[in-house]
Amino acid sequence: LIPMYEPSNQQEAYDMVYNGFNFSEQTGEPILMRMVTRLAHSRSGVERKEQQPQNEISFSEDPRQFILLPGNARKRYKALLQRQDEFIKASENSAYNKYTDGPNKKLGIVACGIGYNYLMENYPEGCEYPVLKIGQYPLPKKQLHQLIDSCDEILVLEDGQPFVEKQ
């Protein structure tokens, strides 16, 4: 229910944390960064962004938002449900979710996080199939339907548990 970012490389991991903090500040909701072992245990140079000024210490007007006892959690859950359309819209417009068309429509590929790198390693000249790269959740429904409607079969590439595959 909360927005999640899943980087495919080190630069994306850096950028997603940077943008994730901004998104969290704008929405007042936490975000989740999904890091897989292979990416977490790797290193690479990244292009740094301009450092933002440190926020002043301020206390929340409603400290209950940080205390998730059952009564508070139920209220927060309802609020999260009401904001799903906002999160989906942000995901639809995210630069981290990218649809790339391909000439061969027999297969459509949904590549999540580092799965996208694995795919591109096998197609150094470019993939002949349509590919939907997922890096921000909730899933971008419009792009997903575009892929499903134009392809005969769908292959989902993801590291670890079948999170996207089961949705």
Model-derived segments and their meaning:
Residues 7-167:
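Flexible, low-complexity linker and terminal segments
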Residues 1:
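Flexible glycine/proline-rich, aromatic-decorated loop/lid segments
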